[in-house]
Amino acid sequence: MTKSELIERLASQQSHIPAKAVEDAVKEMLEHMASTLAQGERIEIRGFGSFSLHYRAPRTGRNPKTGDKVDLEGKYVPHFKPGKELRDRANIYGN
């Protein structure tokens, strides 16, 4: 599901709210989550999961075209850990 599809689905389920308001709310929520993570804070949504930053240590990689070694700097990457309810629902779908 893309962001546009999410906005469309929410707008159709909440017909009393204008589609533009739904779009603005979704965009604002995602922007707030991104800025919170960028500040190094953790986001927890009970039953859904948590977002945090994990550190990737510096390492030596390879250029896929040439095979040359490339030194990669350490960096923080976003990480999502699903909550129990989300894991359980995914298992129902997967079975």
Curated annotation (Swiss-Prot):
GO molecular function: DNA binding; structural constituent of chromatin
InterPro entries on file: Hist_DNA-bd, Histone-like_DNA-bd_CS, IHF-like_DNA-bd_dom_sf, IHF_beta
Gene Ontology CC entries for this record: chromosome; cytosol
Xref: Pfam families: Bac_DNA_binding
Keyword Transcription regulation among UniProt keywords: yes
PROSITE patterns: HISTONE_LIKE
Disordered: annotated span: 57-76
Gene Ontology biological process terms, A to Z: DNA recombination; regulation of DNA-templated transcription; regulation of translation
Keyword tags: DNA recombination, DNA-binding, Transcription, Transcription regulation, Translation regulation
Family annotation (CDD domains): IHF_B
Biased composition regions of type Basic and acidic residues, renumbered to the chain: 65-76
SUPFAM superfamilies: IHF-like DNA-binding proteins
Oligomeric and partner information: Heterodimer of an alpha and a beta chain.
Function: This protein is one of the two subunits of integration host factor, a specific DNA-binding protein that functions in genetic recombination as well as in transcriptional and translational control.
HAMAP family associated with the record: IHF_beta
Family statement: Belongs to the bacterial histone-like protein family.
Name recorded for this polypeptide: Integration host factor subunit beta
Species this chain originates from: Enterobacter sp. (strain 638)
Gene: ihfB
